[in-house]
Every structure is written in C-alpha cells, then in structure tokens.
Amino acid sequence: MKIRPLQDRLIVKRVAEENKTKGGLFIPDTAKEKPLEGKVIAVGNGKVQEDGKVRPLDIKAGDTILFSKYAGTEIKLDGEEHLILREEDVLGVIEK
C-alpha cells in the first residue's frame, strides 16, 4: 500500500534500538521504550500559510529525525509499523 502524506505531515519509520546494553546485558522487548528517532519515508507538499501560500517543509525524505515521545499516529504499511507526524512534532534532524 502506498500513502502520500498531505500538507505538513511526514511518514516516519522508527529506528530500531539496540537489544543489549553497553555492558552486554540483553534488554527484553517488554522493557524497551519506543525509540524517539526515525527515518522519514515520505513528506507532504508543505504547510499552508494564512495568506494561502504553501511553505515547503524543512525536512525531506531520507532524513533521520528526533521527535517527541507522544507525537504522531501509528499506522501499519505492508505489515510494518510507521508514524504519521506533523512537522511541528519534529524536534530536530540528526546529522551524521
């Protein structure tokens, strides 16, 4: 299934966390928190301003982002979990 996000929305796939600590202890899935980092899969056209003009998003497909803990709506695409976020829910772009 393909989804094209609208306006200032993004489709994000969470980045998987490590299964063990730096000390070598394995972390069970029940003890893990959902990661707050993800890779942008698709972006909308931009945010519509009050004057009717569309402002393009600062984020592009392929960016790795950091987002707030309770942000977005969880969806499943082709059996994989994704999030639909608004640009304002993004805290920053991770540059590597």
Swiss-Prot record:
Keyword terms: Chaperone, Cytoplasm
Record's subcellular location: Cytoplasm
Keyword Chaperone: yes
Role according to the record: Together with the chaperonin GroEL, plays an essential role in assisting protein folding. The GroEL-GroES system forms a nano-cage that allows encapsulation of the non-native substrate proteins and provides a physical environment optimized to promote and accelerate protein folding. GroES binds to the apical surface of the GroEL ring, thereby capping the opening of the GroEL channel.
Gene Ontology biological process: chaperone cofactor-dependent protein refolding
Coarse class of the protein's main subcellular location: cytoplasm
Keyword Repeat applies: no
Protein name as annotated: Co-chaperonin GroES
Assembly information from the UniProt record: Heptamer of 7 subunits arranged in a ring. Interacts with the chaperonin GroEL.
Protein family: Belongs to the GroES chaperonin family.
